[in-house]
Amino acid sequence: MSQSLVRTTAALVGGLCLAACAPVQPARPNAVGIAVEPRGGLVLHERAPGTASPTSLPPSAETRDTLQRINSYRAAGATCGTQRFAPAAPVAWNARLEQAAQKHARDMAARRALSHTGSDGSNMSDRVAREAYAFSALGENVSAGYTSVSDALAGWMRSPGHCANMMSKSFREVGVAAASAPGDSFGWYRAMLLGSPAR
């Protein structure tokens, strides 16, 4: 069965661009137009062998702070557009997701282009496969223009599709990264990958 990637259009939030992707194989769209459920037994051919093992503690104070902020949002529950999300379990930091997010953030900054498609035509599942992350559910948020991670996370929480990704109980791991683009009107590009490892 072929892979289906559901995309939402870029949203303008507070004058800054955001874009969200739904998980790779949604069961059906929810009220905000995306689904955040595991792919339900469908085989993805580009999936790398092996299962990524999350790191229990991010390597730096900045990434620990990022993880704490994400998990604070999840613990509080949220209304994403018209959909209410109950509090969700915390996610663990995953170095492979972070690496895939970092490479994509750098690629967007180098091109000065906010996109879920890499300069080589890759999508989020291609990028995590390159980092040997085998997944059962996967989602991606990208943003441009936010100078701090706290502002980027707050922006994603104001956008229904991004918020739904961050609040999804289907995701157990996360990696977030940023890259600067000096001289660009946005200045910073960020990528967040949320996933659950393959069983």
Mark where each language-model region is.
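Bacterial N-terminal signal peptides that target proteins for export
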Residues: M1-A10
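Classic N-terminal secretory signal peptides
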Residues: L12-G15
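Disulfide-stabilized extracellular recognition modules
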Residues: Q25-I34, P38-G40, F135, E140-R199
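A short alpha-helix/helix-coil micro-patch that ends at or immediately precedes a cysteine
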Residues: H45-A110
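Solvent-exposed, polar/charged alpha-helical surfaces in well-ordered, non-transmembrane soluble domains
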Residues: R64-A75, A95, Q99-R106, D126, ...
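Short, surface-exposed glycine/acidic/tryptophan-bearing loops
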Residues: N94-T147, M166
